[in-house]
């Protein structure tokens, strides 16, 4: 089956572990989920045939859960518990670790200077963003008023783009979240945590942008 003409966001929903594959190739399937596989691969100068072959192998496996058929209320509850609550735990700990690493290893050329600042910016943006979703947008959708939520959804999508841009800054600051050979235990643990955060946040944004919001706007 040809996957190159399909949007990344659709492929993530229909193929098990496609999200991990796209993350490996640094392809944006959440904020950039509407771009086709071919376009995304060309932008990164990647071999679309090779990626398509890997997707074909993944597509042979059963998908864990097809969110395209799950009730919107259940999706919202899942987003809050799996992602919102998790981000609220992840970011304060990562900020503490980044502050320590930047202070202790200030004399090293490889230190991720500014990382604590960027993580703090992401924390502040996400804290405000998630509160707005939980207090305004999600209740509207649960009450069947999603088709009237074009304004709030547009704002949320714009804020998703802002978060995606901050993730790119964080990846640039951390050498694509790769610790140097002489990194201490805290440094390595922090980068593991940042990779987990990036995975979680991309899945979170993808589920909202590519499933929840379109279905809500369609009147479900």
Swiss-Prot record:
GO terms for biological process: protein repair; response to nitrosative stress; response to oxidative stress. Its main location: cytoplasm. The keyword Isomerase does not apply. GO terms for cellular component: cytoplasm. CDD domains: Hr-like (cd12108). Signal peptide: none annotated. Coiled coil: none annotated. Keywords: Cytoplasm, Iron, Metal-binding, Stress response. It is found in: Cytoplasm. Pfam families: Hemerythrin, ScdA_N. The keyword Metal-binding applies. Transmembrane segments: none annotated. GO terms for molecular function: metal ion binding. Homodimer. NCBIfam families: FeS_repair_RIC, PRK10992.1. Belongs to the RIC family. YtfE subfamily. HAMAP family: RIC_YtfE. PANTHER family: IRON-SULFUR CLUSTER REPAIR PROTEIN YTFE (PTHR36438:SF1). Di-iron-containing protein involved in the repair of iron-sulfur clusters damaged by oxidative and nitrosative stress conditions. This is Iron-sulfur cluster repair protein YtfE. It comes from Enterobacter sp. (strain 638). The gene is ytfE.
